[in-house]
């Protein structure tokens, strides 16, 4: 996963912000407010990130939700911008720091990786990680 971000940066040195996403595999994550969902355009540019299920399939379309992994590749310029810029309105509402870039028109390129991850945001998440580790050790 890290190698994919590094490779992308080397192939596209002009990109200031790189981030990673992966398909959501567990249905519960779609509605979980601890799982950040990402919508990109056809060129893998970030359009929006939310704790809500996005995009919303109004007509029941079958879609693949993508989740934010939080592995960033930032240029020095992007890092300095982030450190000096005020938290934005949507960033405060959603509590997602990448929205600071979105609201300030700084493009985020998302690299899709095949990585099953478990977010640890609440004490009850620890049991899920322990179960996954135990299962992996038993293989």
What name fits each language-model region?
Residues 1-85:
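Conserved core of the sugar-phosphate nucleotidyltransferase
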Residues 58, 63-139:
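Conserved alpha/beta core of the MobA/IspD/sugar-nucleotide pyrophosphorylase nucleotidyltransferase superfamily
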């Amino acid at each position: 996963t890290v190698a994919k971000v590094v490779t992308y940066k080397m192939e596209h040195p002009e990109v200031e912000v790189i981030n990673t996403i992966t398909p959501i595999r567990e249905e519960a994550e779609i509605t979980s407010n601890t799982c950040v969902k990402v919508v990109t355009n056809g060129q893998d540019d970030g359009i929006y990130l939310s704790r809500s299920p996005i995009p919303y399939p109004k007509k029941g379309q079958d879609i693949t939700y993508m989740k934010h992994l939080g592995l960033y590749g930032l240029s020095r310029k992007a890092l300095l911008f982030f450190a000096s810029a005020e938290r934005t309105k949507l960033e405060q509402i959603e509590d997602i720091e990448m929205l600071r870039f979105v609201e300030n028109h700084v493009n985020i390129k998302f690299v899709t990786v095949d990585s099953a991850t478990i977010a640890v945001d609440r004490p009850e998440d620890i049991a899920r990680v322990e179960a996954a580790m135990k299962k992996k050790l038993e293989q």
